[in-house]
Amino acid sequence: MRAQPLSRAAIVAAARRIADTEGLAALTLRRVAAELDTGQASLYRHIADRRELLALLNEDLARAFPVPGPGPARERLIAQWLGAHRVMLDHPWAAQVINEPTSVTATSLPFAEAAIAAFLEAGLDEAAAAHAYRATWHLLIGQIVNDHPLGHPGFTVDPAIYPALTATRPHLSHLDFVAEFEWSLNQLLNGILGPE
């Protein structure tokens, strides 16, 4: 028997658990209903379809993105984007949901506002701040989506043909996602804002 009444919040929480543990492909209304020990038809009182469920899941995800408090603009940007990266790593399905057409939600606006405000405060004009926001966002999504290291087991590289790949392969085949993102973020900010 269900422990709590059925609500949008309960449906989204169940959807997040399923997506986190089983993947986005497993996220169906039937699966959510089973998780909540209810019939699929009862979900339709709260959500229209899977598309709306994904939009609600995206809203829930955006609420978890950090909006840092006061401090120097560059420090706020680093904290904000590293925090967003942690949220994305915790939810492997996030990049796919964010790429849906319904991904811009009211809950995502505080994150965008804080980042763009920090870029403006750091001295960028409006156009450059918009470009900087997009570039940083693309860095985040790109690193999350491309989560495999170069150098899969069994893959060989001829050192005579690919000397640079051979020399860097130990570094390419091991990937610490957090350290890699932090390094990339700092390099990007150095390019946009100038070195510290």
Question: Language-model segments: what does each one mean?
Answer:
Residues 79-80, 99-135, 141, 155-163:
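Amphipathic alpha-helical packing segments from all-alpha helical-bundle domains
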Residues 9-17, 21-22, 52-68, 72, ...:
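Alpha-helical structural segments
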Residues 46-47, 132:
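Residues in the recognition helix of alpha-helical DNA-binding motifs
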Residues 1-38, 47-55, 179:
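Basic, helix-initiating cap at the start of DNA-binding domains
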Residues 66-108, 133-136:
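Hydrophobic alpha-helical connector segments
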